[in-house]
Amino acid sequence: MLSGLIQRFEEEKMKHNQDRVEELSLVRVDDTISQPPRYAPSAPMPSSMPTVALEILDKAMSNTTGATQTQKAEKAAFASYAEAFRDDVRLRQIKRHVNEQILPKLKSDLSELKKKRAIIHTTLLVAAVVALLTSVCTLSSDMSVAFKINGTKTEVPSWFKSLNPMLGVVNLGATFLMMVCAKSERALNQQIDMIKKEVMKKQSYNDAVRMSFTEFSSIPLDGFEMPLT
């Protein structure tokens, strides 16, 4: 038992001496243990473009849902700017060249659709006038309405009443044409709105690519260090 106590005392003494040696091995300066030198961070800073893109998207989403075409175009422009800030420099240049090639075609299609819509709208107005006139003529002859001309009553002649079947057919055709024109015009309006939105998106994207970083801040933003022409 005594030998065990002696062995235990020796082990604790050796452990204490080892801890003391490790403590003394540290260099003390002004009674404080010196710390390893601090180095400035050399890792590349994270890109600021995704943050800017998120802020632009937050601006677009914080507004109320676009009820008019102008508000929808505004949101499309915000989305395009955010996309331009999020994309890589090479991808931005590729998209820009593709947009420049496709924009003239989109504008040409938009002009053709507007001309077609104008023709259909004019046809719709003519059909509406024809339908209104034939309806009035048919109703007048059916009710045997008498018209006063120079103080004398003049009834609808019998030969005019015989035209009622033909006027009814014309009225039916004009009404059907009105329905077709209205449906076609509604479809054209949707196509025109869609193309306008695409034109706005592509133009806004190209404007964002051409934009100089000095318009935002004095700190260069990645991807805009060199002016893009």
Curated annotation (Swiss-Prot):
Residues 94-116 are annotated as: CCM-III. Keywords: Host cell membrane, Host Golgi apparatus, Host membrane, Host-virus interaction, Inhibition of host innate immune response by virus, Membrane, Transmembrane, Transmembrane helix, Viral immunoevasion. The keyword Transmembrane applies. Residues 14-26 are annotated as: CCM-I. It is a multi-pass membrane protein. GO terms for cellular component: host cell Golgi apparatus; host cell plasma membrane; membrane. It comes from the Viruses. GO terms for biological process: symbiont-mediated suppression of host innate immune response. Residues 185-198 are annotated as: CCM-II. The chain crosses the membrane at residues 119-139, 162-182. Disulfide bonds: none annotated. It is found in: Host cell membrane; Host Golgi apparatus. Its main location: host cell. Plays a role in the inhibition of host innate immune response. Interacts with host OPTN and thus inhibits the recruitment of TBK1 to the host Golgi apparatus. In turn, downstream partner IRF3 cannot be activated and IFN-beta production is impaired. Facilitates viral particle release either by increasing plasma membrane permeability through a viroporin-like activity or by viral budding. Forms homooligomers via coiled-coil motif. Interacts with host OPTN; this interaction inhibits innate immune response. Belongs to the orbivirus NS3 family. This is Non-structural protein P8. It comes from Bluetongue virus 10 (isolate USA). The gene is Segment-10.
